[in-house]
């Protein structure tokens, strides 16, 4: 196994984790709909317990996503998580209050009331997808950081990378295109949340409301996502010379990546078709409740392709707007050959982990959630 192969292999795995994370944001998307779908306390508890079965998957995937970056591309981890820490701290804090809200909203002695924690779930449902989408957009639009590896020998301050301003990552929200993708991810999460609850909840009224909410959320998602994607295809991209490592701007770089790596373009089209199929069939057929699966697979495929064209084909996946030559690539930010090779063998266990997750998912969802189950005091309902 060559060093180049392992660098591309680990970018593929991280891209897959990122794609799975976006799919699992259906938990956050559904939680933004607590009061839109739930008109009674029992209906709201149905929504919360539906997502409550899966919130750990989203949280652990987020942590694993960051951990994989730390192991495979540590310079990105130190630059982004260490420099843009306010952005990531807000994201992580919103996920922490999510966990607390699930556990304590209906506990005895909750003097804040269940509604307070339900509002916290909505906050996480909005902030999480919005900021994660904005963070991913910086892979294409750049961030303000400087990298100087020579500083590692400086005794007074051996800091390799630092943020170029005092915003500590919050400046990403000043770029309207980062916000556009963030809003697109938010509406996508709401769509997936609606499809998931329609499949997971055995309550006719709630399922009908989910269907009615699909169309406006889909239209909003398409407006924001297509605006970002079309602009992405025509904008200049960040490329590096494979021999020298010098980074330069290249016109239509991301479109070129899709054309050069043409199998990815096919995967992208399949993903879009699957996503729209899941949405439209659910909206058009009253008795169809499995739209989450084609839509979920489509989401994973589309996001996977976006990540891959951001890092493969001599593309700088984390561009620097402050210093172009500080931009990070899978070559200049990766771990050593020994580390990547060792982790390669460990990664062969991933299919077994996925099989266990699938088993747990099936065990939790083999029976659809009902109002009676939520009302049962002996159940473990939230």
Stretches found by the model and what they are:
Residues 366-382:
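Short, highly charged, low-complexity non-transmembrane loops/tails of multi-pass membrane proteins
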Residues 108-289, 305:
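Long, contiguous internal "core" modules enriched in hydrophobic/ aromatic residues
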Residues 1-59, 63-66:
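N-terminal signal-anchor module of multipass membrane proteins
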Residues 246-252, 318-339:
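Short, membrane-exposed interhelical loops at transmembrane-helix boundaries
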Residues 296-326:
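A C-terminal functional module that forms or caps the active site or interfaces directly
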Residues 8-22, 82-95, 122, 126, ...:
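Alpha-helical transmembrane segments
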Residues 24-32, 52, 60-108, 124-151, ...:
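Transmembrane-helix bundle segments that line or gate the permeation/cavity pathway
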Residues 280-287, 356-371:
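Membrane-interface capping segments at transmembrane-helix boundaries
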